[in-house]
Amino acid sequence: MAENEFVKIRRELHKIPELGFQEVKTQRFLLDYINTLPQERLEVKTWKTGLFVKVHGTNPTKTIGYRADIDGLPITEETNYSFQSQHEGLMHACGHDMHMAIGLGVLTYFAQHEIKDNVLFIFQPAEEGPGGAQPMLQSDIMKEWLPDFIFALHVAPEYPVGSIALKEGLLFANTSELFIDLKGKGGHAAYPHTTNDMVVAACQLVSQLQTIVARNVDPLDSAVITVGKIQGGTVQNIIAERARIEGTIRTLSPESMTRVKERIEAIVKGVEVGYQCETAIDYGCMYHQVYNHHEVTREFMEFAKEQTDVDVIECKEAMTGEDFGYMLKDIPGFMFWLGVQSEYGLHHAKLQPHEGAIDIAISLITKYFEHKGNQ
């Protein structure tokens, strides 16, 4: 294909962002493209709205896995791209369109060129929620085609084009959503003594939650509790019967996640008693930490440093969440950041990753597969 063909593919995918487990058009686009490739060594299996694509090696002794996530976000795009999202209120604001284009680029090469070992491409739905990695990992297809090691990348607006960033060990945090519902007794604003005001209770709860990181988490560990949304009440002269708090929890260790949740539950119970209300906690979508296995990560870093067109940066761990962590929990492998140099960050309505990173990533991964898959 022409050198810029995968930029065109990225732009077509950018037009059709879809939420988790709703990626029907995306799956159809991927299948239609894959069907144009030589089929002699390819085997394709669908899973919900995702795909497994196996490239059969000529004399395989192992299977190498590459995962690309495929879902978009509920964000109204503000890029002014000529290829802006055609789905109102949805956007590829986390670079998954780039991830897919890169995956298709590498897949195209190995559909056309022999490799000794098997290569498994996993196009995974629902990374942004409710989480596709864990159920995909537990699927019969994955059990049948289980790779011996696996890796993935994620675009990074803060790093320049031509760079990748990674480290051995912990890369991304443990993450959990947080939803807290409060129900009290509403009433007229002139008679507060006859009510249990859930706006006041919610405000008290938000303040108390912020003490957890400061006083209940080891200072040498890290945790973040973010309350991003509060809902309560209906109009200005009615005391609110209900309130809802929505946020996230992020910790660098599983032990801290357990401790933080224990403290949240204790504090919520205290608010329930103090404000004579009913409460409910839902942790929603929870992701395991991304932990890069030392040996394979070190080997990849050494390989990448030998490439003249890639700058390898050893980064620090981040409080980002990624359900690829579930795959790395069961399969040796790693994840790395791909520099895409954008003024705006991930999950921003104006994110514009530099498309020059697509060919750089395709080249690096193709060379690495040839290195690993022909040993």
Curated annotation (Swiss-Prot):
Q: Which UniProt keywords apply?
A: Amino-acid biosynthesis, Diaminopimelate biosynthesis, Hydrolase, Lysine biosynthesis
Q: Lyase: present as a keyword of the record?
A: no
Which top-level enzyme class is recorded in the Swiss-Prot or TrEMBL entry? hydrolase
Q: Which GO terms describe its molecular function?
A: N-acetyldiaminopimelate deacetylase activity
Pathway of this protein? Answer: Amino-acid biosynthesis; L-lysine biosynthesis via DAP pathway; LL-2,6-diaminopimelate from (S)-tetrahydrodipicolinate (acetylase route): step 3/3
Q: Which InterPro entries is this protein grouped with?
A: AcetylDAP_deacetylase, Amidohydrolase, Bact_exopeptidase_dim_dom, Peptidase_M20, Peptidase_M20_dimer
Which residues does UniProt assign to the signal peptide? none
Question: EC annotation?
Answer: 3.5.1.47
Q: Which GO terms describe its biological process?
A: diaminopimelate biosynthetic process; lysine biosynthetic process via diaminopimelate
Active site (UniProt): D69, E128
Superkingdom: Bacteria
What this protein catalyses is:
N-acetyl-(2S,6S)-2,6-diaminopimelate + H2O = (2S,6S)-2,6-diaminopimelate + acetate
Q: What does this protein do?
A: Catalyzes the conversion of N-acetyl-diaminopimelate to diaminopimelate and acetate.
Q: Which family does it belong to?
A: Belongs to the peptidase M20A family. N-acetyldiaminopimelate deacetylase subfamily.
Instruction: Spell out the protein name for this chain.
Output: N-acetyldiaminopimelate deacetylase
Q: Which organism is it from?
A: Priestia megaterium (strain ATCC 12872 / QMB1551)
Q: What is the lineage of its organism?
A: Bacteria, Bacillati, Bacillota, Bacilli, Bacillales
